[in-house]
From Swiss-Prot:
One MF term in the entry's GO annotations: NAD binding
Membrane topology label: Peripheral membrane protein
Record's subunit section: NDH-1 is composed of 14 different subunits. Subunits NuoB, C, D, E, F, and G constitute the peripheral sector of the complex.
Keyword set includes Acetylation: no
Taxonomic lineage of the native organism: Bacteria, Pseudomonadati, Spirochaetota, Spirochaetia, Leptospirales
Family (UniProt): Belongs to the complex I 49 kDa subunit family.
Cell compartments where the protein resides: Cell inner membrane
Function: NDH-1 shuttles electrons from NADH, via FMN and iron-sulfur (Fe-S) centers, to quinones in the respiratory chain. The immediate electron acceptor for the enzyme in this species is believed to be ubiquinone. Couples the redox reaction to proton translocation (for every two electrons transferred, four hydrogen ions are translocated across the cytoplasmic membrane), and thus conserves the redox energy in a proton gradient.
Stated name of the protein: NADH-quinone oxidoreductase subunit D
Encoding gene, per UniProt annotation: nuoD
Length: 406
């Protein structure tokens, strides 16, 4: 892969002497409303892909450097804008990292709600991935078939956080606010409607002969190559590797719920789609085990040095006002050291490596974003295939530019 500012010189040297009959085709920069701004310069011989150069950096926003300037709660505005299709998963991953650094134990109520929102976000992400993949291959109706259910999940997030997309969900030590009274009832209604909708979507798209011919055996990758590239999440499991952070390195209460890990066979575009279909059903299974068991209790830990007190108490209590002032002006202080924590985001292992010197901001932040590794493998996965198959491969990898470039 190359950064965008070097492409002119780089491509001029690499593709200077093309064999007779070969052409250069730009796949992208694509419109931001699709998968984000991505570009691939593809050398073709007829309809066959000979070579590919992937370009990154079009939406690079210096998030890691911003992490060294913002305090630990403020960095949520950056995690919101990584994989913007399932923002709560990014937020929860960051907050869990900071709580691990500070050894904060949140109430069970907080953990239950975080897990439920995580799985709802995973469902949203997979709906978009599989739905948009159908659109990219010419089947538009499947996406619309599930959009109603995705909208219902957005309404849950809007009521819970005040925002649909950039939710800044959670705070260090808990949640910004408690769940609303109809939270559990509305989620049960969503699950009730989503189950038959997934079955219908599968019949409409996945079982479609044309879709199968466009995706079966296309853009495949072996288990060994996937591991070598650093794959994780649905794309690794589609290659036949049953690895999931929720199972293999459990966090929150994932070791206390029952769910299966779907795996594929050849890591093809079809396998990646089928794995995501089954993962949506497994996410619903997890939510069903949690939704009726949300315990009573506070929505934050008893950590006044890191969690803002409620506004009504700030206005009437001197101690609460002091805590409020200290947190806003001096931030959350984290013990010195190096920390890494990973969670299973919708695209795979999302990890945060943080170096702290005991200040209100990290000394260094690095984000292990799963899309970065998939995009590196893309040229190898499409080499020798048809130009039209590059679209199916890219869609099934679910490369989100906001997460890729950070």
């Amino acid at each position: 892969m190359v950064m965008y500012e070097k492409t002119a010189e780089h491509f001029g040297q690499k593709f200077k002497d093309l064999p007779e009959g070969h052409l250069l085709v730009n796949l992208g920069p694509s419109h931001p409303a699709t998968h984000g701004i991505l570009q691939n310069v593809i050398q073709i011989d007829g309809e066959r892909v000979v070579d590919t150069e992937s370009v990154i950096g079009y939406v690079h926003r210096c998030f890691e450097k911003l992490g060294e300037r913002y305090d630990y709660n403020q960095f949520l505005v950056c995690t919101d804008r990584m994989n913007y299709v399932s923002t709560p998963l990014n937020n929860i991953g960051w907050i869990l990292t900071v709580e691990k650094m500070m050894q904060i134990q949140v109430p069970d109520r907080v953990t239950y709600v975080r897990m439920i929102i995580s799985e709802l976000s995973r469902i949203m992400d997979h709906i978009i991935c599989n739905g948009i993949m159908g659109v990219d291959l010419g089947a538009f109706s499947g996406l619309l078939h599930l959009f109603h259910h995705r909208e219902n999940i957005y309404q849950i997030l809007e009521k819970l956080t005040g925002a649909r997309l950039t939710t800044t969900f959670c705070r260090v030590g808990g949640m910004e606010r408690d769940i609303y009274p109809e939270f559990q009832t509305e989620i049960k209604l969503i699950l009730k409607g989503l189950k038959p909708a997934l079955d219908e979507f599968e019949e409409l798209l996945i079982r479609n002969k044309i879709f199968n011919e466009r995706t079966k055996g296309i853009g495949g990758i072996s288990a060994d190559r996937a591991i070598a590239y650093g794959f994780s999440g649905p794309n690794l499991r589609a290659a036949g590797v049953p690895w999931d952070v929720r199972k293999d390195d459990p966090y929150m209460f994932y070791d206390k719920v029952n769910f299966d890990i779907p795996v594929g066979e050849d890591g093809s575009a079809l396998d990646r789609t089928l794995v995501r279909m089954e993962e949506m059903r497994q996410s619903m299974k997890i939510i069903e085990q949690l939704i009726d068991g949300i315990p009573e209790g506070p929505y934050h830990a008893d950590v006044p040095h890191s969690f803002l007190p409620p506004k009504d108490r700030v206005y009437h209590n001197m101690e609460e006002l002091i805590y409020h002032f200290k947190i806003i002006m001096h931030g959350v202080k984290v013990p010195p050291g190096e920390y890494y924590h990973a969670t299973e985001a919708a695209n795979g292992e999302l990890g945060f490596y943080v170096v702290s010197e005991g200040d209100k901001s990290p000394w260094r932040v690095h984000v292990r974003r799963p899309c970065f590794w998939y995009y590196q493998a893309f040229p190898e996965m499409v080499k020798g295939g048809l130009l039209a198959d590059t679209i199916a491969t890219m869609s099934s990898l679910n490369v989100i530019a906001g997460e890729l470039d950070c």
